[in-house]
Regions:
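Soluble non-cytosolic domains of exported or imported proteins
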Residues: 59-68, 102-109, 117-121, 132-140, ...
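Conserved catalytic neighborhood of penicillin-recognizing serine enzymes
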Residues: 94-126, 206-227
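C-terminal segment of classical bacterial N-terminal signal peptides
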Residues: 21-29
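Bacterial N-terminal signal peptides that target proteins for export
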Residues: 2-15
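Penicillin-recognizing serine hydrolase domain
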Residues: 35, 134-227
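Active-site SXXK
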Residues: 48, 61-85, 174
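A short, well-structured edge-of-sheet supersecondary motif
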Residues: 30-53
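Short, well-structured active-site flanking segments
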Residues: 76-90, 185-194
């Protein structure tokens, strides 16, 4: 297992358990306000130095921030032009949704947009199955990537973040992951979108989806990622 001191990287994230990620350093105004999150970790963008933290190494549920890894693994293993046909099981996924319908066909890029902008659990499952052949195989890739990055307090059990006792991370590990992911140009472009047109290829129907991450509207320089 890697020592925590060696896990510091060129990352830049302010992370909480139900996490808002903002690249850069805390402003004086933000530093003066008491943090109410149960856990957070703020890293310097260039040095990987932990500027401030609270319970940064405590294992907690990661919820929809799971999709940061889902998007990263998909981008590293498949082209954005890959077409995905939605199954009945995926269309009925519980929780936050793109409201996909069985038989619909989308590009991987549009599913990644829906997954990050509106946190579609249905899209996450469809992406996982198509990229790796099965959800289990995709989750294996997620855990392998976590080990590569140095996420020592993280284990993935699904690609969407619904509750599982075997699905957890820490604020520090999320900071590592987000800093790593933002080095991927396509990932950075997708998560920083304020809105996007999502096209179903069979019918040609296009829906506009708006990013639910209020940080990108409220703070100059915020690059998005997940809340």
């Amino acid at each position: 297992m890697m020592k925590r001191s060696s896990r510091l990287r060129r990352a830049a994230c302010a992370c909480a358990v139900i996490t808002a990620v903002v690249l850069g350093v805390c402003s004086p105004a933000a530093a003066a306000s008491p943090a109410t999150a149960g856990a957070y970790c703020v890293m310097d963008a260039q040095t990987g130095e932990v500027i401030c933290q609270k319970n940064a190494y405590t294992r907690m549920e990661m919820a929809s921030t799971t999709k940061v890894m889902t998007a990263l693994v998909a981008l590293e293993n498949a082209p954005l032009s890959l077409t995905v046909r939605i199954t009945r099981a995926e269309a009925g996924t519980e929780g936050s949704s793109m409201y996909l319908r069985a038989g619909d066909v989308y590009t991987l890029e549009d599913l990644l947009l829906g997954m990050t902008l509106v946190s579609g659990n249905d899209a996450a499952l469809a992406v996982a199955r198509t990229v790796a052949g099965s959800e289990a195989s995709f989750v294996r890739l997620m855990n392998e990537k976590a080990q590569e990055i140095g996420m020592c307090d993280t284990h993935f059990d699904n690609p969407h973040g619904l509750h599982s006792q075997q699905h957890y991370t820490s604020a520090y590990d999320l900071a590592l992951l987000c800093g790593y992911a933002m080095q991927n140009a396509e990932f950075c472009r997708i998560v920083s979108c304020k809105s996007a047109g999502i096209k179903e290829l069979t019918s040609g129907e296009t829906r506009v989806m708006v990013n639910k991450n209020r940080f990108i509207y409220a703070f100059e320089g915020a690059d998005g990622i997940k809340i």
